[in-house]
Amino acid sequence: MSKALNGYPNVSEETRERVNEAVKELNFTPNPIASALSSKKAGRVALLIKLNTKTQAVDEINMQYLSGAINRAVEKKLDVITVFFSMIRDWNAEEIEDYFRSQSIEGIIIYGMGMEDMVLHQLIEEKRFKIVVVDVPIVNETTSSIQVDHEQAQYDVARKTVLENGGRSILYISGKLDGYVTQERLAGMQRLAREEKLSLLIKKGDFSEKKARELTFRYARDVDVIVCASDLMAIGAMRALQEMDIFRPVCGFDGITLMGYAGMQMNTVKQDFYRISSKAMDEMGRLLEGGAGRRMVLDHQIIRMQYQDVIS
């Protein structure tokens, strides 16, 4: 019966019609999960996502990721489940594989993977699943990468802010050291400093509003411009400057809605997280159909977010 309902090619048209008539008479509703588990047309896709449990302020990014992937999966008739890093944090590669196989998972879209996530690196290297990594520059036969050009984007927003406001010294508040995007954005800042002959002071902010605030209190008086590797840190820096009663141009990175409520307009890199995730699901569909892994780079925008831009 399940083979007839799920469109298997080796079921005759006569049998399929009889099953459909019985379904109507019995008012039977197929279980979509069971259908996905029994169907061999396409495997299920896991969305593996790392939540920031220390703050709720950046939940918008993960929600946009989930919305983009799930809506596109519905359009492509792919079944998806959401798995959080915290669920598999202490598992080895074999345990993760067993879990995903038990869920009929054939593809994984990974969000927030760091350089130190060695078990995930092992899964990628051993090609156990079709994988799309977001913001990670790793590609092999079964793995694709999708992201904006973080080095160029960081260069663009910082250069625009420096040229608009002048100044020869920059405090750069970076993200987490094990993050691939952190290294790429840092490279963009170092290139800008070389080209424009700027003094560059680099401090690790871990994408934390609180740490950015503390670093601003400590170093802002000695620099001309503050460049932050995330909007959340830019907001922390701006609030600290207001309390210090001094002005320094600040720019961020991401384009989250919260920037519209910051009180001061700041340049930022606008990433379309919904589109990135939707494209990641498209790429997963291509991999599941036998395509080879590849690197995909999407465009970015430099914008100034205003309150009017974020209210509905």
Where are these regions (language model features)?
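N-terminal helix-turn-helix DNA-binding module of bacterial transcription factors
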Residues: S2-G43, S312
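Short beta-strand elements in bilobed, periplasmic/extracellular small-molecule ligand-binding domains
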Residues: A73-F85, Y172, M189-K211
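Periplasmic-binding protein-like
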Residues: S104-G112, L171-S174, K203, A220-L232, ...
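Alpha-helix capping/helix-boundary segments
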Residues: M115-E116, D178, R185, L232-A234
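Hydrophobic alpha-helical segments within soluble ligand-binding/sensing domains
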Residues: I146-Y172, E209-F217, A234, Q271-E289
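An alpha-beta-alpha
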Residues: V157-E196, A292-I311
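Flexible loop/turn connectors
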Residues: R221-S312
